[in-house]
């Protein structure tokens, strides 16, 4: 039987925990059985020791066990991609990954985006979508209805992971990034087959990549070398390339992990994109960011479009399954498809269908209550 003194003591002794023990800790937290001091002590000790993929895997397993169920048909789920990143880079850019989600859906790839309201910025993905007219607090049936009608859906973390409310206070009071900061992109309740994940914390980016590789997810994990949790348009980015493929049951039972993801450097200038100053991507409140989003969908050129195209191209590469080719070549090949989704009006049409479908689903849910 695990205990908090045992787990925190082991971490302070710089001993890594197996997934069963971190799953126990997360189960206690999700059940409301852990005190704020225990939650904070565990998170800080884990960070000080350095998180491993197995430890993160245990946290994810317990968090999923407490989540509201969402069952997306396999033929859709397997093709779908999530563009959710970790946030926390303190750059206060506009909602690049959310805009990229609309572009990817406009290119014909199903998108199941996991997200929440703002934590470290003025406008989170949920804030932006609500401002654009999307009903965000939908039950599972509403999420699936949006996916079928518009090719895109939003899983609001507060709806599907209500037990995470126990983490909010200690996390805010600690004030430094911990493992809790990376769980959002790794706990999408729909479990899409592909992900494009920006990670702000340089320590945790390779850990996130290995977790996704062990899961068999097709993915690109990236971090701008300027600290942005995006493919930055200002300088180089580091990308971890994960082709995906289901791990074998025998391998999982033996505790084997997938091969380490391939690490590459990406320079946006190699695909014809360069933004000299990140300041031109600064966002503000939800009305401002919504106006920027609508301008993008209307075809407005400029640094926001260029940066969103990079993000959308990365998501398209992840959805298709990264190959052995250099990642720069793969992103370059996907850029025209992303641009066409905007210029043809397809991405804007996705937003129109999504707002209609989500509002209808919200009305149906209200009647059912």
From Swiss-Prot:
It catalyses: N-(5-phospho-beta-D-ribosyl)anthranilate + diphosphate = 5-phospho-alpha-D-ribose 1-diphosphate + anthranilate. Homodimer. Mg(2+) 1 binds at residues 97, 230. GO terms for molecular function: anthranilate phosphoribosyltransferase activity; magnesium ion binding. The lineage of its organism: Bacteria, Bacillati, Actinomycetota, Actinomycetes, Frankiales. InterPro entries: Anthranilate_Pribosyl_Tfrase, Glycosyl_Trfase_fam3, Glycosyl_Trfase_fam3_N_dom, Glycosyl_Trfase_fam3_N_dom_sf, Nuc_phospho_transferase. Its cofactor is Mg(2+). Anthranilate 2 binds at residue 171. PANTHER family: ANTHRANILATE PHOSPHORIBOSYLTRANSFERASE. Binds 2 magnesium ions per monomer. GO terms for cellular component: cytosol. SUPFAM superfamilies: Nucleoside phosphorylase/phosphoribosyltransferase catalytic domain, Nucleoside phosphorylase/phosphoribosyltransferase N-terminal domain. 5-phospho-alpha-D-ribose 1-diphosphate binds at residues 85, 88-89, 93, 95-98, 113-121, 125. This is Anthranilate phosphoribosyltransferase. Pathway: Amino-acid biosynthesis; L-tryptophan biosynthesis; L-tryptophan from chorismate: step 2/5. Keywords: Amino-acid biosynthesis, Aromatic amino acid biosynthesis, Glycosyltransferase, Magnesium, Metal-binding, Transferase, Tryptophan biosynthesis. Its EC number is 2.4.2.18. Mg(2+) 2 binds at residues 229-230. Pfam families: Glycos_trans_3N, Glycos_transf_3. Anthranilate 1 binds at residues 85, 116. The gene is trpD.
């Amino acid at each position: 039987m695990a205990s908090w003194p045992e787990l925190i003591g082991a971490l302070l002794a710089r001993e890594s925990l197996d997934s069963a023990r971190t799953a126990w800790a997360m189960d206690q937290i999700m059940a409301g059985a852990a005190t704020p001091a225990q939650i904070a002590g565990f998170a800080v000790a884990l960070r000080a020791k350095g998180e491993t993929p197995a430890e993160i895997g245990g946290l994810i397993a317990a968090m999923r066990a407490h989540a509201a169920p969402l069952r997306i048909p396999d033929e859709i789920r397997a093709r779908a991609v999530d563009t959710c990143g970790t946030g926390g880079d303190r750059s206060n850019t506009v909602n690049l990954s959310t805009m990229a989600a609309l572009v990817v859906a406009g290119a014909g790839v199903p998108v199941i985006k996991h997200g929440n309201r703002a934590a470290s910025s003025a406008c989170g993905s949920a804030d932006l979508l609500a401002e654009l007219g999307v009903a965000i607090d939908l039950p599972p049936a509403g999420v699936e209805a949006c996916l079928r009608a518009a090719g895109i859906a939003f899983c609001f973390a507060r709806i599907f992971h209500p037990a995470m409310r126990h983490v909010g206070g200690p996390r805010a009071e600690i004030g430094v990034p911990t493992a809790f900061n990376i769980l959002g992109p790794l706990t999408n309740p729909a479990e899409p087959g592909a992900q494009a994940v920006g990670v702000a914390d340089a320590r945790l980016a390779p850990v996130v990549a290995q977790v996704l590789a062990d899961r068999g997810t097709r993915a690109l994990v990236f971090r701008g070398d300027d600290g942005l949790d995006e493919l930055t348009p200002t300088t180089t980015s580091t990308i971890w390339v994960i082709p995906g493929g289901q791990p074998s049951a025998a391998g999982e039972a033996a505790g084997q992990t997938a091969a380490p993801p391939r690490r590459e450097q990406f320079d946006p200038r190699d695909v014809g994109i360069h933004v000299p100053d990140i300041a031109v991507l600064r966002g503000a409140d939800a009305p401002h960011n919504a106006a920027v989003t609508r301008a993008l969908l209307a075809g407005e050129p400029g640094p926001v479009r260029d940066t969103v195209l990079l993000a959308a191209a990365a998501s398209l590469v992840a959805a298709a399954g990264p190959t052995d080719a250099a990642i720069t070549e793969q992103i370059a090949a996907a850029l025209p498809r992303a641009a066409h989704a905007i210029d043809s009006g397809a991405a804007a049409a996705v937003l129109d269908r999504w707002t209609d479908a989500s509002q209808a689903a919200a009305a149906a849910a209200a009647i059912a209550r």
